[in-house]
Each structure stands twice: as structure tokens, then as C-alpha cells.
Amino acid sequence: MIETIKSIILDFQETRLETGVLRRMMIETVRGKAAICIGVRRGGKSTYMFQVIQRLLDGGIPRENILYLNFFDDRLHNLRQDNLGMIAEAYYAIYPEKKNTETVYCFFDEIQAVPGWEPFVDRFMRTEKCEVYLTGSSANMLSKEIATQMRGRALSWEMFPFSFREFLDYKRIESDGTLSTKKRLLVQKAFEEYWETGGFPEVSGLTRHLRIKIHQEYFHTILFRDLIERHDVSHPKAVIDLAHWLVDNTASLYSINSLTGYLKSLGHKAPKSAVSDYLEWFEDAYFLFTVRIFDASLARRDTNPKRIYCIDHAMVTSVSSGILVNSGHLLENLVFTALRRLYPEIYYYKTKIGREIDFIVLMQDRTRILVQVCESLTAPQTRKRETTALSEAMAELGLKTGTIVTRNEDERIEDEAGTIRVVPAWRFLLDLAESVE
């Protein structure tokens, strides 16, 4: 096994790095702490690691000081918690002169493939002169349990598929600063493409047929590798049927009871506890996200219906039956993922008389913003419904501003509650920060 690991290490050091489009996210390293990058499969984590490696090389770090392993490599299938020490043994067998004298930069891709990896990384960082970077497709890598097992030696960052601004970077369209008329038209045209293709890097620029095929491949890989195999699911068809129902009902409300009843109607014997587990696993894989009602009572947050969203709006189009999902749902999903990329605490809001606001976002400084999503406000009845609901919520929460995201409309509405900004989706996405300080 040691010879195999040595071979993999040396092979990588001779490999040309494919660094792709530079991501706007920046992982900051802290001395003595592992940097963990987590997110959905095929979302760009490995490519981002190559970008970090390239920056190190450009800064004068020798290629021999880079140790990279992808734990999804079939040749590493036999690695277990009790023999992970072979990695250090293999590396220092190649470069004995570097031990305890030079910093080794370790990149362990998809390390969650080896259960119980945490003590190895913790020990490695305590005993060797190194910097450690990890990637994984499991939100468990954010958990307090891992922080405990790593003795506080880890900092985590989430990576999502391309933001709209990163998509513009891929298209080589300048989007920073004030936009000229020509640049604005280019940005608007690019938004229509982003609307069709979504943010997964691999599908950018592909034909519709190939994009759908690849999205569906992602869908099945996530289900089988991240859920069914990882959790040894005894009734995989129930997981698959549930995933399809949830994608078909993107941006809609659900309850555990309704989902359990749906699976029962298909002949599955999945109790409520199993359905709750499935939902947790979907979220853990960064595939589907649950949004709860905004309420001071945790019990009411849990018992009220919840909304479901997918990691990528275009993936919904590629996977769903198309019967229940409409462009309004897709726009709402797009806005959700843009917000979730920055802010983990997102809820929906219900006014005292039952009017719903799509998103209330809790910022890091505990201030709150309200975001409503509506394709178009041109119909008078729709305009009245959306603005009245937002005004009510603003008044109840003591907020002076609110936002309605549309496909193309742009205006400001002043009423007694405050200012409602109506903004087209492309502008809303550009106005969002790329990271939270």
C-alpha cells in the first residue's frame, strides 16, 4: 500500500494543474488549523484546491512540498482509519530530508470517504511541519463533533456552484463597478444563459442535451454515493422516489406527514423517522435545503410546514418532470441559493394575518432583510398581493426596507411601511457580496 501511495504522490507532482475559472471565494489559512472546503459534488472543490496549489507554486513553494491525495481514487480504497499513517510514511520515504525541516502542504480531497479520518489529521498536524487543506461533500464536516475530534484545529468554508458573478468571470465579462450600457446588455444576455445552465462548472457552455445528461448523472451519483451507500440504506427506491418528489416540488411547502404518506402511497414502508433521516442526508450532501418558518419558538419552527430548495435551479429543470415546477419556482430557487451561499440562517415569514414572505435572512450582525420573489408585478392583483405582504412584514418587524426580486422589473415603491425595492434578478445577484467578512 505504501508503494501505491508513493506512486500517487509522484504522479500528481508531474501532473499539469487544471485550475479552471478563478473562484471569488478565498479560504484564509490560520497557523495550526486545517482549512476545510465543503460542498456538493462537482461544485468545484477540487479545482479550487488546484488554484490554491498554483498560488503556492507561484509564490515559490517547491512542487515536491505538495502532497495531494484524492480519497475517491480507487487505488486508495483499502485505506482505513487505522492505516492512514501510511500517508506520512510514504511521503517521507520519498523526501526524508524534508521531515521536520520544511513545511509540507497537504491537500486531502474528499477525505470523508475514510470514516474516522479526524484523529489522523489532528495527529499529523501536531507531529509534522505542515499546512493541511481538506475537501469534502458532507456538511458533517461543519459539525461540532468534528471540531471536538480535531481539538479545535479546523476552520470550514462552504463552496457552492458558480455564483452569477463567477459565471460572468467564466464568460470573461467584466462585472465589477458601474456598468456602461454595453456592459449591462452583455450582463443581461449572460444572465439568460446562466438561467438556462445554472452554476455547475462542468455544464457551462454545453448543449442542452449534454447539460441535462450531466445533471441527471450528478443527481444519481449524489443519491447513490452520498446517501444510499454512505448510510447503507435498506430501501433505496424510497430515497430515490422522495428525491424526485422534492425536486418536482421545489420552492413548495412540505411536512414530514405528507412525505411519509406519499411514500406509503407508492408502497414504501418508510416511517416518519426514516423520512426525517433522508431529509437530513439530502441537506448533508448539499443537494436539497430545508427552510423553516421564522418563529421565536423552536417547536413551532419544527412543526410548521417547511420549504424545499435545490442546490441549483438548472439542475431542477434537468431532473424534474416539469409538471409542478414553473419559472416562478425556479426564480425563487435561484434567489435562495444566492442568499444561502452567503447566509446560513434563512427562513420564510408569515405575517399575523397569514401573508407569506419568501425569505427573511439573518445577517451576521443579527440585522434582518426581507426578500420576496415574483416573476412579474405587471398584473395589478399580483402587484397588490406582493407589496401588501412585504409592507405588512416590514411593519411587524420594524424594518424600513424590503426587496422584491423579479425577472426584469426595476423600480422603487414608497409606502407608509418604508421603501420597497423592485429589482431584476441579474441586478440582485450582482449586488450581493461574494463573501461575508
What residues fall within each predicted segment?
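Interdomain motor-coupling "hinge/lid" segment immediately C-terminal to the ATP-binding subdomain
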Residues: 2, 10, 139, 145-253
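N-terminal pre-Walker A segment at the start of P-loop NTPase domains
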Residues: 1-26
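Conserved catalytic segments around the Walker B and adjacent sensor/switch elements
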Residues: 58-74
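Conserved lysine of the Walker
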Residues: 45-46
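Short glycine-rich substrate-engagement loop in P-loop NTPases that contacts/grips substrate
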Residues: 69-101
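Domain-level recognition of nuclease-like catalytic cores that cleave nucleotide substrates
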Residues: 407-437
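Hydrophobic anchor at the beta1->P-loop junction of P-loop NTPases
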Residues: 37
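Accessory nucleic acid-recognition modules appended to NTPase machines
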Residues: 65, 208-367
